[in-house]
C-alpha cells in the first residue's frame, strides 16, 4: 500500500538496527552542536509541531535561549498535571453556598441530594490552591528567562495570562481575608479562571476557542435571523389560537407562547404542546408540522451550514499559521546549512543532514546511489540543487514516512545479559506476529470466561466464584504480557503507543483491584465486591476491535474511526470546558435551592420526574445535569423548574444561552466536522488502494503526505487533506 522513499525498503525494516554511539539529544544539539546537528534538531522540532519564537531563532543568543527553552519543556508533564489539578479542584471544593448560615448543614448529603465525592476542608483547599498557584506562577513567568521581557510582553497570550494570574491571586487573597457573610450572592471568580488557564495552556483547546472566537460574529448574525423567525412564528401562533382551547390553556400570553414555541423549536415538547389544538381540530396540526419542518429541517440546518463554513474559514487561517511557523523553523535549519547564503543546498549538504537526522528518525542506511535517486526525485526543478521549498518537501517526507528513533531501553546497561542469545531470541519472539496471535487467543478465551461468569452471576449460581478466580488469573497474564513488551522495547518506546498506554493503565487497575478484592475485609463493600473488576476486564478486551482491521470490508471504517477520535478530542474538550463554566455559574446561582425542606420543590417537574438528584448543589451533580441538558432529554424540565424555584424569568437566560452555545453551535459543529472528516478519510483509503493506477503527480503527493506515524501527524494530515483547496487559495493570497 505504501511507496517508500527507498525502493524496496520500508522504514520499519531497520527499526531494530542498533547504531554505535549515543543518540544526540536535540537540546544539546541546538545549544552546543555543529551547524548540521542544529539543523537536524530543528527539522525534528518542526515536524513534531514544536516551534521557538521567530525572534529567538534569529537572535544572537539563540543557543542559550534554546537551552533554557528545552529545560523548561522537560517539566511538561508537571505543568500538564498542575493544570489538570486546577480543574479537578472544582470537583472537590466545597460549594460557596455551604458557608452560609443554613438551617440544615450541607454535610447532610441526603437533605441536599449531594453527590458522593467528598469535600475538601478549608485548610486542605487552601493548601491545594497554594501549591497549584505556585506552579502556575512558575510556568507562566519562566518563559521570560529565554524570551526576554520585551519579547515575552509583546505576546497577547502572555499578557492575558499575567493579567488573569493577578486576578486569581486577588481572588484567593479576598476569599481568605473576607468573611463569607460579606457576600450577598456567594461568588468567586477562581473556578472560572482555573478552566481558563487549562484552556490557554492546552494548545489544541486554545486553538479551538480561538476558532470559535473568530466565527462568533457570523454565528450571532445567523442566530439573530433565527430569532426573527421564532418571534414571528410565536406572534402568529398567539394570534391564530387566541380564541381556541390552545390559546386559553397553553398560549395564554405572548411571552408564554414565545417560550413554548422556542421549546418546540428543539422538539423537546413535541407533540405535547399542541395537543389541546389537535383536540379542537385535526387541521390545526398543519400549523405545527409546518413550523417544525421549517424550524428543525431548514433553519437549524441553515445555521449548521453557515457555522461550518465560518469554522472552515477560521480553521484554514489557523492551519496556515502553523504551516508558516513550521516553515520559519525549517528556514532557520536551511540557513544553518546554507553557509554560502545562495538559497540552495547541494547533494553533499543533504547527505550530511541525513546522517544527523538518523539520530532522530529511523532511516535505513543510505548508499550513495540510493541517496542520488532520492535527491533527484525531490529535486523538482531539476537543477541538482534543493531550494527552500524543496527542502520543506524533503522534511515533510521524512516526518511522515519515517518513525521516531527508538530510545535505548534501560536494560542496555547490562548488554551482556540483554544481548545474550536467549534474550535476543525472546525479544525476537515478542516482536513477532506469533506472540500477538497468542495474546488475541488469550483475549478470546478471556471473553468467553467473562460471558460465563456474568451469566452465572445473573443466575446467582455458586459456580461464579470459580470463574472469578479464572478472571484473576487472566489479569496476571496481561501483566506478564506487559512486562515482556517493556523488556523488549523499553518503557519509553512501549509508552509511545496509545494502545500500550491503555493496556498498561487498565491492566494495573485490574490487578490491583482484584488483589484488593481478595484481601479486603467483607465489611468494606466497595473493595470486597469484585463486580466493578468485570467491567475493566471488558474494557481490556476492546483490543479485539483491532481484529476488524484484518477484514477488508471493515478496515476503512475502523481506521477512520480510530483517526477521528484524536481529531475530535479538542472539540469534545471545548464542550467539557463550556460545561465547567456553566456548572460553576449554576452552583453560584442555584446552589442549595433543591433540598428536602423547600416547600415549593414538590410542585415542580423535577420532583414529578424524579430528577431531584440532577441539581446544581455540587460540581459533580452539576456536570451530570448539564450533560442531560446537552443531549436535549426533557431539558425544559430543569429550565421551568428552576424558574419556579427562583421566582424570576432571568433563569431562562442561563438555560437558553447554554442551548445556543453548546447544542446549536458546538454540537452542530462536531456533526459537520465528523461528516467531512469521515469523507476525507474514505478518500484517502480509496486513493491508497489505487496506487498502481495513479499518475506521477498523485504518486508524488502521496509520497510527501501519507504514512503518518504519530497522533498529531495523523490529525495534521487529515486537516490538510480536508482543507487542501482552501489552503491553496490562502497560499496564493499570501505568497
Swiss-Prot record:
Regulation: Inhibited by Al(3+), La(3+) and Gd(3+). Up-regulated by H(2)O(2), cryptogein, salicylic acid (SA) and cold shock.
Keywords: Calcium, Calcium channel, Calcium transport, Glycoprotein, Ion channel, Ion transport, Membrane, Plant defense, Repeat, Transmembrane, Transmembrane helix, Transport, Voltage-gated channel
GO biological process: calcium ion transport; defense response
UniProt GO cellular component terms: monoatomic ion channel complex; plant-type vacuole; vacuolar membrane
Membrane topology, as annotated: Multi-pass membrane protein
InterPro entries for this protein: EF-hand-dom_pair, EF_hand_dom, Ion_trans_dom, TPC1_plant, Volt_channel_dom_sf
Compartments, record wording: Membrane
CDD domains: EFh
Glycosylation sites: 460
Intramembrane segments: 249-263, 619-633
UniProt topological domain (Cytoplasmic) ranges: 1-76, 147-161, 203-208, 308-431, 492-501, 550-560, 676-735
Subunit structure: Homodimer.
Further comment found in the protein's record: Rescues the Ca(2+) uptake activity in yeast mutant cch1.
Function statement: Functions as a voltage-gated inward-rectifying Ca(2+) channel (VDCC) across the plasma membrane that mediates sucrose-induced Ca(2+) influx in autotrophically grown leaf cells. Acts as the major ROS-responsive Ca(2+) channel and is the possible target of Al-dependent inhibition. Plays a regulatory role in defense responses.
Family note: Belongs to the calcium channel alpha-1 subunit (TC 1.A.1.11) family. Two pore calcium channel subfamily.
Cited PANTHER family: TWO PORE CALCIUM CHANNEL PROTEIN 1
Protein name according to UniProt: Two pore calcium channel protein 1B
Gene this chain is encoded by: TPC1B
Amino acid at each position: 500500500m505504501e511507496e517508500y522513499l527507498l525502493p524496496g525498503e520500508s522504514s520499519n525494516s531497520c527499526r531494530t538496527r542498533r547504531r554505535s554511539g549515543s543518540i544526540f539529544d536535540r537540546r544539546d544539539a541546538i545549544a552546543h552542536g555543529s551547524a548540521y546537528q542544529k539543523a537536524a534538531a530543528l527539522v525534528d522540532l518542526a515536524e513534531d509541531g514544536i516551534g521557538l519564537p521567530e525572534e529567538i531563532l534569529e537572535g544572537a543568543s539563540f543557543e542559550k535561549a534554546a537551552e533554557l527553552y528545552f529545560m523548561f519543556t522537560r517539566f511538561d508533564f508537571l505543568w500538564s498535571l498542575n493544570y489538570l489539578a486546577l480543574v479537578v479542584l472544582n470537583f472537590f471544593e466545597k460549594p460557596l453556598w455551604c458557608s452560609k448560615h443554613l438551617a440544615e448543614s450541607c454535610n447532610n448529603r441526603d437533605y441536599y441530594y449531594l453527590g458522593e465525592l467528598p469535600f475538601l476542608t478549608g485548610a486542605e483547599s487552601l493548601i491545594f490552591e497554594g501549591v497549584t498557584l505556585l506552579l502556575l506562577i512558575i510556568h507562566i513567568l519562566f518563559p521570560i528567562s529565554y524570551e526576554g521581557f520585551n519579547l515575552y510582553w509583546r505576546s497577547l497570550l502572555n499578557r492575558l495570562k499575567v493579567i488573569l494570574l493577578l486576578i486569581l491571586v486577588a481572588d484567593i487573597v479576598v476569599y481568605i481575608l473576607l468573611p463569607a457573610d460579606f457576600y450577598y450572592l456567594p461568588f468567586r471568580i477562581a473556578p472560572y479562571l482555573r478552566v481558563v488557564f487549562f484552556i490557554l495552556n492546552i494548545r489544541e483547546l486554545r486553538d479551538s476557542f480561538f476558532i470559535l472566537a473568530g466565527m462568533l460574529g457570523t454565528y450571532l448574525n445567523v442566530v439573530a435571523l433565527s430569532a426573527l423567525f421564532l418571534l414571528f412564528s410565536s406572534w402568529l401562533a398567539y394570534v391564530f389560537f387566541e380564541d381556541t382551547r390552545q390559546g386559553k390553556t397553553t398560549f395564554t400570553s405572548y411571552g408564554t407562547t414565545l417560550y413554548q414555541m422556542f421549546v418546540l423549536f428543539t422538539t423537546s415538547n413535541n407533540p405535547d404542546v399542541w395537543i389541546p389544538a389537535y383536540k379542537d381540530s385535526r387541521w390545526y396540526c398543519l400549523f405545527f408540522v409546518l413550523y417544525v419542518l421549517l424550524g428543525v429541517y431548514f433553519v437549524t440546518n441553515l445555521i449548521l451550514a453557515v457555522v461550518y463554513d465560518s469554522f472552515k474559514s477560521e480553521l484554514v487561517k489557523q492551519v496556515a499559521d502553523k504551516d508558516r511557523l513550521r516553515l520559519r523553523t525549517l528556514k532557520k535549519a536551511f540557513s544553518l546549512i546554507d553557509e554560502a547564503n545562495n538559497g540552495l543546498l547541494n547533494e553533499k549538504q543533504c547527505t550530511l543532514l541525513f546522517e544527523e537526522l538518523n539520530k532522530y528518525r529511523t532511516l535505513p542506511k543510505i548508499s550513495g546511489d540510493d541517496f542520488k535517486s532520492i535527491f533527484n526525485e525531490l529535486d523538482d526543478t531539476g537543477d541538482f540543487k534543493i531550494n527552500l521549498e524543496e527542502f520543506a518537501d524533503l522534511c515533510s517526507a521524512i516526518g511522515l514516512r519515517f518513525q521516531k528513533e527508538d530510545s535505548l531501553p534501560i536494560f542496555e546497561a547490562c548488554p551482556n545479559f540483554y544481548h545474550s542469545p536467549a534474550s535476543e531470541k525472546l525479544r525476537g519472539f515478542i516482536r513477532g506476529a506469533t506472540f500477538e496471535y497468542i495474546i488475541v487467543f488469550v483475549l478470546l478465551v478471556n471473553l468467553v470466561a467473562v460471558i460465563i461468569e456474568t451469566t452465572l452471576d445473573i443466575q446467582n449460581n455458586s459456580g461464579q466464584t470459580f470463574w472469578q478466580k479464572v478472571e484473576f488469573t487472566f489479569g496476571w497474564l496481561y501483566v506478564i504480557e506487559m512486562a515482556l513488551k517493556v523488556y523488549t522495547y523499553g518503557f519509553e518506546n512501549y509508552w509511545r503507543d496509545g494502545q500500550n498506554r491503555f493496556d498498561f493503565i487498565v491492566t494495573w487497575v485490574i490487578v490491583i483491584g482484584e488483589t484488593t478484592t481478595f484481601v479486603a475485609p467483607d465489611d468494606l463493600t466497595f473493595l470486597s465486591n469484585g463486580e466493578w473488576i468485570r467491567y475493566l476486564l471488558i474494557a481490556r478486551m476492546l483490543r479485539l476491535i483491532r481484529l476488524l482491521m484484518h477484514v477488508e470490508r471493515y478496515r476503512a471504517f475502523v481506521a477512520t474511526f480510530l483517526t477521528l477520535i484524536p481529531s475530535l478530542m479538542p472539540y469534545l474538550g471545548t464542550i467539557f470546558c463550556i460545561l465547567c463554566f456553566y456548572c460553576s455559574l449554576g452552583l453560584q446561582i442555584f446552589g442549595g435551592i433543591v433540598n428536602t425542606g423547600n416547600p415549593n420543590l414538590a410542585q415542580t417537574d423535577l420532583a414529578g420526574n424524579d430528577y431531584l438528584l440532577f441539581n446544581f448543589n455540587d460540581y459533580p451533580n452539576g456536570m451530570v445535569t448539564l450533560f442531560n441538558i446537552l443531549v436535549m432529554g426533557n431539558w425544559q424540565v430543569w429550565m421551568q423548574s428552576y424558574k419556579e424555584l427562583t421566582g424570576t424569568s432571568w433563569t431562562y437566560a442561563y438555560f437558553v444561552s447554554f442551548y445556543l452555545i453548546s447544542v446549536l453551535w458546538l454540537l452542530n459543529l462536531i456533526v459537520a466536522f465528523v461528516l467531512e472528516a469521515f469523507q476525507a478519510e474514505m478518500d484517502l483509503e480509496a486513493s491508497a488502494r489505487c496506487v498502481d493506477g495513479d499518475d506521477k503527480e498523485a504518486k508524488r503527493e502521496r509520497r510527501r503526505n501519507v504514512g503518518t506515524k504519530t497522533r498529531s501527524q495523523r490529525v495534521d494530515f487529515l486537516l490538510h487533506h480536508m482543507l487542501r483547496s482552501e489552503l491553496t487559495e490562502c497560499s496564493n493570497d499570501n505568497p
